[in-house]
Amino acid sequence: MNKEEIIQAIKEMKVTELVELVKALEEEFGVSAAMPVAAVGSPVAGAAAAAPVEEKTTFDVILKDAGANKIKVLKVVREITGLGLKEAKDLVDSTPKPIKEGVSKQEAEEIKAKLEAEGAVVEIK
């Protein structure tokens, strides 16, 4: 496995998997991934440098309200989640609830568009 393949594999990991990987690397090599305090500099400079790096890559799609057309929204929720009729109905009836978590921005926008087309109120976090 070369460097590019390793990087690609890391890109495809979920956040929880990345946390486990970092812990395993720390244990294996006896190091810490925490940045030393002396290297950070002033808190203001550290915060300014960290802000652009923290761009969100995974999003949660939250159904805020099913609207007047619950049956059509229910069908879309079942299509998106793969839930059974009862589970999807319970989810739609107990808004606000997350429909899909940890998805890409593009997928979140597509899900939001499908649900809003049926009259639902949707939020992406």
UniProtKB/Swiss-Prot annotation:
InterPro entries noted in UniProt: Ribosomal_bL12, Ribosomal_bL12_C, Ribosomal_bL12_C/ClpS-like, Ribosomal_bL12_oligo, Ribosomal_bL12_oligo_N_sf
GO terms for cellular component: cytosolic large ribosomal subunit
GO process annotations (BP): translation
Entries under PANTHER family matching the protein: 39S RIBOSOMAL PROTEIN L12 (PTHR45987), LARGE RIBOSOMAL SUBUNIT PROTEIN BL12M (PTHR45987:SF4)
Similarity field: Belongs to the bacterial ribosomal protein bL12 family.
Family matches, as NCBIfam families: L12
Protein name: Large ribosomal subunit protein bL12
